[in-house]
Amino acid sequence: MPELPEVETVMRGFRDAFEGHRISHVTVNRPDLRWPFPADLREKLEGHHVLSFRRRAKYILVRLEGGWSMLLHLGMSGRLTIGRAGTNATPPAHEHLVLETDSGARAGLVDPRRFGMVDLVRTSEEDSHRLLAHLGMEPLSDAMTGPALAELFRGRRSPIKSALLDQKLIAGLGNIYVCEALFRCGIHPERQACTLTGEETAALAEAIPQILEQAIASGGSSLRDYVQADGTKGAFQDLHLVYGREGVPCPNCGAEHPIQRITQAGRSTFFCPTCQK
């Protein structure tokens, strides 16, 4: 599933092509993904200018004149392809929704597994939408501080990795970047969240935004299906220190201490048992 840096990267590509332009045509190639498309989707989009974009956790919000926003989630393997309308290129398979602007931009939502979703919400009520209302703090916001994390983790006996992945606490973090952040901070993923010291929560509050910003600058991590909006792969996978590197020597403590993989809550966790305590 695309994580925060990948969604942010896609959102920026979408924004660059569509912001300030009028949606001239909407093509719905199937009536649903995870859930049915809104019955009035075409009515709310066609003929309206795109005012701005916003990312909330792993969701993209497209704000339109008329007071409505389109809410988009890419699901497990969805992607958004940006190009030019009117070309003779064959549309990709599993392209379920196409938006075109008066400037000739084209966006196609491709989702082979159909775990993504599209919905409409009044712009003034975005944060009350059922999928957004219970999300936690944004890790790239000023709210991400050591004391704030310490308060979130107070009394929580769950593993720190599970706490960081809890979208009700911190919105948008995923498996890749949590593994990387815990490694950089020397924190074992199975540690109880409530045992972290003030120094450790401060280190996490600094490392998490740094890693996310580095990943965004690299276009995200292309491991399976993910590509940027222009169809090119991201490059941050080449900078992973632990994720997907089981058996590789630890970049900190060397060949005698390879990276290990364990399973937590059904997900692979990569870490160094020597460096991370």
Swiss-Prot record:
Do you know which InterPro entries this protein is assigned to? DNA_glyclase/AP_lyase_DNA-bd, Formamido-pyr_DNA_Glyclase, FPG_cat, MutM-like_N-ter, Ribosomal_uS13-like_H2TH, Znf_DNA_glyclase/AP_lyase, Znf_FPG/IleRS
**Zinc fingers, FPG-type class:** 241-277
The entry's free-text remark on the cofactor is: Binds 1 zinc ion per subunit.
- A GO BP term, please? base-excision repair
Describe its function. Involved in base excision repair of DNA damaged by oxidation or by mutagenic agents. Acts as a DNA glycosylase that recognizes and removes damaged bases. Has a preference for oxidized purines, such as 7,8-dihydro-8-oxoguanine (8-oxoG). Has AP (apurinic/apyrimidinic) lyase activity and introduces nicks in the DNA strand. Cleaves the DNA backbone by beta-delta elimination to generate a single-strand break at the site of the removed base with both 3'- and 5'-phosphates.
Q: Where does DNA bind?
A: 94, 113, 156
Q: Where is the active site?
A: 2-3, 58, 267
PROSITE patterns associated with the record = FPG_CAT, ZF_FPG_2
Taxonomic path: Bacteria, Pseudomonadati, Pseudomonadota, Alphaproteobacteria, Acetobacterales
Name this polypeptide is given:
Formamidopyrimidine-DNA glycosylase
- CDD domains assigned: EcFpg-like_N (cd08966)
Q: Which organism is it from?
A: Gluconobacter oxydans (strain 621H) (Gluconobacter suboxydans)
Taxonomic superkingdom? Bacteria
Subunit record text: Monomer.
